[in-house]
Design a protein with these regions (language model features):
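Core beta-strand elements of the Rossmann-like FAD/NAD(P) dinucleotide-binding domain
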Residues: 93-102
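Internal hydrophobic alpha-helix adjacent to the cofactor/substrate pocket in enzyme cavities
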Residues: 15, 332-355
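Glycine-/small-residue-rich beta->alpha transition segments that form the dinucleotide
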Residues: 102, 107-111, 268-269, 281
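Glycine-rich phosphate/pyrophosphate-binding beta-alpha loops
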Residues: 322-330, 386-388
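Extended, charge-enriched "interface" segments that sit outside catalytic cores
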Residues: 384, 401-574, 578-582
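A glycine-rich dinucleotide-binding beta-alpha-beta segment and adjacent secondary-structure elements
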Residues: 260-326, 354-367, 485, 496-550, ...
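An anion/pyrophosphate-binding glycine-rich loop and adjacent beta-alpha core
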Residues: 8, 137-274, 362, 371-456, ...
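Conserved N-terminal/central alpha/beta ligand/cofactor-binding core
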Residues: 1-79, 94, 106-123, 130-136, ...
Length: 582
């Protein structure tokens, strides 16, 4: 499987910073690693890894089975037990009853799952795995609204049938980057190649001829699919003028011939999929392991949740992942961690643990879900976050690890690593702010580095702000700075490159970071004005009709959350501020 990607990679780093396992497992099983969006600023950089599927599964299993106090039962849940609006347990298909103080539902695509290949339909949660029945209906009986969504997966190909010489190669990166902040985490597997090629007009012609048998276009599938990961048939219909679409061929592991064709998700009949692919020169002799297919499944309206991911309707019942209308491992993992933390807090007492929009992409994700809801599968992008510069991949540990440590989730070793990094960054930045540079001593070096010589003395930090200058290339010409860097990173030499990169980002982007932090702090004042349960919105005639309807449905916690609800205007917010005595 692929882990990470644009914005998703930041979520995995946040999960790791909070003490989660996804980053560690991904590093351990990565067979290709890349940083995406390198040509843009560091707020947009996102790690992505292709993992060995078999090793990924076993690594996760090993971690789960060796987690203290975690007990595993293999079965299918068919009913929740609810008393007086509070979940108290569940029943499985084997007739086993579990009593519980809290339950976290993470059913993925399995609730009433139905797979489609052409006109063929097959019940299931994914290929060769049965769907889960009865559970949706059990939950809906208590007044929780649900709907249907659709996702898809591409064909799997036998590598022995591919003409790799007719494709472009895409190599991984072997530098210091990884997902986990832990210095014990390493990427030790051999980096494998991926390949790219393109569809053509002949491919599109065959796909178009198959559209009458496509469940997406013949009415067989009514549910909504992901806008930003469309099927190949959706691409050719939506973009009829586009002559080609890029395809990525990705290995499934070190020791398997199975390849994953990213960019060719489809639910067309199998013969159409094969015939179309044979028109791509590299695939002219293609042999497949299985066709692409679409899957429909149930999800629950996430506006029925609190920011803790606890249901507003059934106390102590939490929802996480695709059952909330999201796509992807990363979004699911982030939600699962927050739901799990809050389920524990509900059992043992304490304040709900939530993340704000300026703290984490996970905070943006959950706030979007519970405030705006979903009408299509939700995928995280950097563009969904208004504080991108504050939510960079390099500083997830600085944002979140201390909070996780005080919760008891991040261990002492993780916390100490974060503190060591923080001290090193402060030492480097303070030295750069205070060290004076003289033109006579540095101008020759500046000219060699392709930047303007100094006319008068300045602080080192001013030179570091120039685009041609990096910490490493200027340190070669400033021995005192080189010594300071060695001293600052001596306690964490394994992560020296990571610390230097983070320091350079802090120095070059400090003005933008400060400005974004100031905007976030202004909006935080609205976050402090609690309004949940204060108003009978339906009776406030000075609100617009749409605002009244939306506010009744969402029942926001704060003025700030109310301001993010689609259909609630600034004038509606002013009405609420006046009624709040502000």
């Amino acid at each position: 499987p692929a882990v990470g990607g644009i914005a998703k990679g930041q979520i995995v780093r946040e999960i790791d910073a909070l003490g989660g396992q996804m980053g560690l497992v991904t590093d351990e099983t990565a067979i290709q690693f890349r940083i995406l969006n390198r040509s843009k600023g560091p707020a947009m950089w996102s790690p992505r890894a292709q993992c060995d599927r078999a090793k990924f599964i076993w690594s996760w299993r090993e971690k789960l089975e060796n987690t203290p106090n975690l007990h595993i039962w293999q079965d299918t849940v068919c009913e929740l037990l609810v008393e007086n609006g509070e979940v108290v347990g569940l029943v499985t298909l084997w007739g086993v009853t579990f009593k519980a103080k809290c339950i976290v539902l993470t059913a993925g695509t399995f609730l009433n799952g139905l797979m489609h290949v052409g006109r063929h339909q097959l019940p299931g949660g994914r290929m060769a795995e049965p769907a889960s029945y009865q559970l949706t209906e059990s939950i809906a009986r208590h007044g929780i609204a649900y709907g249907r969504m659709k996702t898809g997966t591409p064909v799997r190909i036998d590598a022995r049938s591919i003409h790799f010489d007719l494709m472009d190669t895409q190599d991984g990166e072997c530098d210091f980057h990884k997902f986990s902040f832990m210095n014990t985490s390493t990427r030790h597997l051999k980096q494998l190649q991926c390949w790219t090629c393109y569809t053509n007009e002949e491919v599109h012609r065959i796909l178009r001829e198959g559209l009458p048998d496509s469940p997406l276009f013949n009415g067989q599938i009514q549910s909504i699919g992901p806008r930003y990961c469309p099927s190949i048939e959706t691409k050719i219909v939506t973009f009829p003028d586009k002559e080609q679409h890029q395809l990525f061929l990705e290995p499934e592991g070190e020791t398997t011939q199975e390849l994953y064709l990213n960019g060719f998700s489809s639910s067309l009949p199998m013969d159409i999929q094969i015939a179309a692919l044979k028109k791509v020169p590299a695939f002219k002799d293609i042999v497949i392991y299985r066709p692409g297919y679409a899957i429909e499944y149930d999800y629950f309206d996430p506006t029925q949740l609190k920011h803790s991911l606890e249901s507003k309707i059934i106390k102590n019942l939490f929802f996480a992942g695709q059952v909330n209308g999201t796509t992807g491992y990363e979004e699911a993992g982030g939600q699962g961690l927050i739901a799990g933390i809050n389920a524990h807090i509900n059992c043992h007492g304490g304040e709900a643990f939530t993340l704000a929009r300026d703290e984490a992409y996970i905070g943006v994700l959950i706030d979007d879900l519970v405030t705006k809801g979903v009408d299509e599968p939700y995928r995280m992008f950097t563009s969904r976050a208004e504080y991108r510069i504050l939510l960079r991949m390099d500083d997830a540990d600085m944002r979140l690890t201390e909070r996780a440590y005080h919760l008891g989730l991040a261990r002492e070793d993780r916390y100490q690593l974060m503190k060591t990094k923080k001290e090193a960054l402060e030492q480097i930045v303070n030295f750069a702010k205070n060290y004076s540079m003289k033109p006579a001593l540095i101008n020759d070096a500046l000219e060699k580095l392709g930047t303007t010589p100094l006319r008068q003395g300045c602080k080192l930090i001013e030179i570091l702000n120039r685009p041609q200058i990096t910490i490493e290339n200027i340190a070669e010409h400033v021995p005192a700075f080189q010594r300071e860097l060695e001293k600052a990173t001596a306690a964490d030499s394994d992560r020296k490159e990571e610390i230097l990169e983070a320091a350079e980002i802090l120095i070059k982007y400090q003005g933008y970071i400060d400005r974004e932090r100031m905007i976030a702090e202004k909006l935080a004042r609205l976050e402090s004005i609690k309004i949940k349960g204060k108003f009978d919105y339906a009776s406030i005639q000075s609100l617009s009709t749409e605002a009244r309807q939306k506010l009744v449905k969402i029942d926001p916690e704060t003025i700030a959350q109310a301001s993010r609800i689609p259909g609630v205007s600034p004038s509606d917010i002013n009405v609420l501020l006046v009624l709040s005595g502000r």
